[in-house]
């Protein structure tokens, strides 16, 4: 019986990881509207509120989904996430994570600690 439980647990972990892992190349295409505020590999953003480059994709997914479900509200973000699927969010989060460091380090720009704090709410 314990073997069956161990196999079931391993299968659940593997399937969850496969679903949660996004594709950065697809995320780059789907997240083009995110670049104006959050930047990209070669662009810091017009008014970079939160630079997402190199951020933990799980934290980004959690926070983005809170905007999608209405648990968090922002005039810009709440509109930006309309129509995104779970897969879209995973892909966009993977894209920003794959960038590494932000194009332009800006003092005072919020980062992972803000994302983690808001995601925990």
Give the ranges of each region predicted by the language model.
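Sequence context surrounding c-type heme c attachment/ligation sites in exported
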Residues: 24-35, 44, 53-62
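Flexible coil segments in periplasmic/lumen-exposed cytochrome c-class electron-transfer proteins
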Residues: 21-31, 40, 72-75, 79-121
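N-terminal signal peptide c-region/cleavage motif recognized by signal peptidases
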Residues: 15-17
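Regular, well-ordered alpha-helical segments
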Residues: 36-39, 69
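Sec-dependent signal peptide recognition
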Residues: 1-9
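Amphipathic, hydrophobic secondary-structure cores in small proteins
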Residues: 52-53, 63-79
């Amino acid at each position: 019986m314990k073997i069956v439980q161990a196999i079931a647990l391993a299968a659940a972990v593997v399937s969850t990881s496969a679903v949660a892992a996004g594709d950065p190349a697809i995320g780059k295409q789907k997240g083009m509207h995110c670049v104006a505020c959050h930047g990209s590999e070669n662009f810091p953003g017009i008014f970079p509120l939160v630079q997402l480059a190199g951020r933990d994709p799980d934290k980004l997914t959690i926070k983005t989904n809170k905007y999608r479900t209405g648990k968090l509200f922002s005039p810009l973000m709440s509109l930006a996430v309309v129509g995104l699927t779970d897969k879209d969010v995973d892909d966009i989060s993977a894209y920003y994570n794959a960038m590494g460091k932000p194009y332009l380090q800006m003092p005072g720009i919020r980062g992972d600690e803000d994302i983690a704090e808001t995601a925990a709410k």
